[in-house]
C-alpha cells in the first residue's frame, strides 16, 4: 500500500507515529493535552474578546497582548487537532504539502511569538524609563509597523524551508517518528546531503533566541536601573509590578526552549519519546499559561472578567 503512495521525489503522504514507544498510552496521554488545548482556546479567546470590547484596553501594552494571544491560538491549533486525531482515531496520514504547511506555520509563528515578546519588553522599557514620551513613542502607526516587521521576519526566515524540503528524495520511507511535522524530523527521512537544512535550521533558531533574548535582557537592565532610582519603595514596587506579567510570559516561553536544548545535549541518547514530550510541552505550555498570567496579574483584565460573572449572577 505504501509504495503506491510514493512518487519519484517524495511520498504523497507522511505517517505521523505519535509518541514512539507509547502508542498504547495515546488515549491516556491525550487527556492532559486536550485539557491544555481547551484552556489555551478559552483563555486566549477571552483575552481577545476583553481587549476588543473594552476601549480602555486599546493601549500599546494590550495590543501587543492581543498579538500574543492570536499567535498562541494559531500555534496550538496548528498541531493539537491533528495530534488528538492521531491519539484518538489513529489518523496518522498527513499529505506531503499539508505537512510542509504545518511546519511553516509552526516555525513561523514561534518566531513571531519571540518578536512580540521583544516588542512587549520595549513597551515596558518606554513606559518605565521614558513615561512622559510613552504615548508619543508608541503610536498606533509604530505598533502596526512592529507587528508587520514581526510577520515579515518570520515569513522571510521560514519561506525557504518548504522549498528546501521539496528538493529531496525521501528514500527512508514516509514514517515520521513525531506527533507533527517538525523540520528536523522530516529531514531525517531524506536522502542526499541534508547538511544545509541542518545548518540553516540551527542557525535560524540560535539567531532568533539569542538576538531576541539579548534585547529583552538589555531592556530589563535599563528598567531595573530606572526602578532603583525611584524615590519610594512603593513607587519601585508599583513600577516593577507592571512588568511581572511580561516576565512570566517570557519564562513560560523560553524556559521550555532552554530545557529542551539542554536535554538534547546532556541526554542525547535518551529515548525519542522524551524529546517529543518536551517539544509538545514547549508548544502547549505558553498558550495555556499566558492568559492565566495576564488574567491574574493585570487589574483591568481581572476586573472585566469579574464584572462579566457578576452580571450573570444578577
UniProtKB/Swiss-Prot annotation:
Gene Ontology terms, MF aspect: G protein-coupled receptor activity; olfactory receptor activity
Pfam families: 7tm_4
Signal sequence segment: none
Key words of the record: Cell membrane, Disulfide bond, G-protein coupled receptor, Glycoprotein, Membrane, Olfaction, Receptor, Sensory transduction, Transducer, Transmembrane, Transmembrane helix
Cytoplasmic side: 49-56, 123-141, 220-239, 297-314
Bilayer-crossing regions: 28-48, 57-77, 102-122, 142-162, 199-219, 240-260, 276-296
Cell compartment(s), UniProt: Cell membrane
CDD domains documented for this protein: 7tmA_OR52K-like (cd15948)
Residue pairs linked by disulfide bridges in the UniProt entry: 99-191
Gene Ontology cellular-component terms listed: plasma membrane
Major localisation: membrane
Positions bearing carbohydrate: 5
Extracellular compartment segments: 1-27, 78-101, 163-198, 261-275
Membrane topology: Multi-pass membrane protein
Family statement: Belongs to the G-protein coupled receptor 1 family.
Role according to the record: Odorant receptor.
Protein name according to UniProt: Olfactory receptor 52K1
Lineage per the UniProt record: Eukaryota, Metazoa, Chordata, Craniata, Vertebrata
